[in-house]
Design a protein with these regions (language model features):
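Metal-dependent nuclease catalytic cores that hydrolyze phosphodiester bonds in DNA/RNA
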Residues: 1-78, 85
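A short linear-motif detector with a strong N-terminal bias
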Residues: 47-49, 94-97
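Short, glycine/acidic-rich beta->alpha junctions
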Residues: 60-61, 95-99
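Short beta-strand-loop-alpha-helix junction that forms the active-site gateway
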Residues: 81-94
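Metal-dependent nuclease catalytic regions and adjoining charged, substrate-binding loops involved
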Residues: 91-96, 109-181
């Protein structure tokens, strides 16, 4: 599944990068170049893999892998590609709640308020696209969460586990054994 998701990302990114050549007013923007041209000196480019760029924001201690940035009809959008099962995809009506913090983080880091989510049904490659406009309130709320988290980290105290956190959210967490105590 991971490899098929990666393959789908690469194919979509490649298709987007070729749109301008066939007359569509859509340009795939190199993220590292965008960071440099916009003088986003607070961001570190940690690497590239195909179209994706690994970025690190030291002040917030956040690293992330950006699928891309597109410029469509003169406007910039952060591109975030998601693949999902037919069951989730069929009922998809907007950006998943689980993806809001991710979009908000990317928006803060890249200075772009609009995120284009492209959800692909991994069973038949059908697609749905949604634009999420990240508001100042969303950014303030996320920064508040990061600050709270940093306080726990600096005090070497694990934060209380939120009641609504899913098991999936804990899968790659370095502290999941501490939470179970």
């Amino acid at each position: 599944i991971c490899e098929s998701g990666t393959d789908r990302h690469e194919r979509i990114q490649r298709a987007v990068s070729q749109m301008q050549a066939i007359g569509i007013d859509c340009e795939y923007v190199d993220v590292a170049q965008f960071v440099q041209e916009r003088e986003l000196n607070y961001l570190q480019v940690r690497g590239k893999s195909g179209f994706e760029t690994k970025l690190y924001y030291p002040e917030l201690n956040i690293s992330f892998l950006c699928d891309g940035i597109i410029k469509y009809k003169g406007k910039y959008y952060i591109l975030e590609i998601k693949t999902e099962s037919i069951y989730k995809w069929q009922s998809r009506e907007f950006v998943a709640d689980d993806h809001l913090n991710q979009a908000t983080t990317y928006s803060i880091c890249l200075g772009l308020d609009d995120v284009l989510f492209l959800y692909e049904n991994r069973d038949n490659c059908d697609k749905k696209a949604y634009i999420l406009h990240v508001t100042e309130d969303m950014k303030a709320e996320l920064l508040k969460k990061v600050e709270e988290c940093d306080t726990y980290v600096s005090n070497l105290i694990p934060p209380p586990k939120p009641a609504d956190v899913s098991k999936k959210a804990c899968t790659y967490c370095s502290y999941k054994t501490v939470c179970k105590k």
